[in-house]
Amino acid sequence: YLLMLFSEILGQDYIKNHLTASALSGRIPHAQLFVGPEGSGTLAMAVAYAQFILCQNVGVENAGGNESCNLKFQSFSHPDLHFIYPTVTTEDVKTKPKSLDFIADWRSFLSGNPYGSLFDWYQILGVQNKQGEIRVEDAQEILKLLALKSYEGGYKITILWMAEKMNVAASNKLLKLLEEPSDKTVFILIAENE
């Protein structure tokens, strides 16, 4: 598995230093927007930041914190880390697709190419002419997950990749969550365009 450590993300030292400093000082904004063109590493940066927070790591090596927590990040399976991303109907998921329906494919996608594009993701899903989108079912799933206590007693982090693919119903439901977040909840929205 490929680890997503700050030290493995090329350049962007100012951003890495800012993120680690805010985490170490305990000033972690509950909602953040990472914007960058395809291939700029916004997803890798978001995962490295989530790992830094959840595992209580120090420095750009993302080490020195909770080792079992760091191990869970190798397979992107930390129980307090949630992902939302565009999905489509497929042979297996015929109606109301949501991110959790494709979590194994997502982890494989992340492991294989943390700088992967939306096109690469659609290839894995086997999308022909369909447009992927983030639907209200994802927002409802996140509401349920965030209502639970964190597994490790710390933060709960949701990374929303390709935020511009949210439909209106999903964005309305998520907006309410962003406006009134529960304690120790962090949302990282990733977009290619502001």
Region locations from a protein language model:
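Conserved catalytic/switch belt of AAA+ P-loop NTPases
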Residues: A147, N172-V186
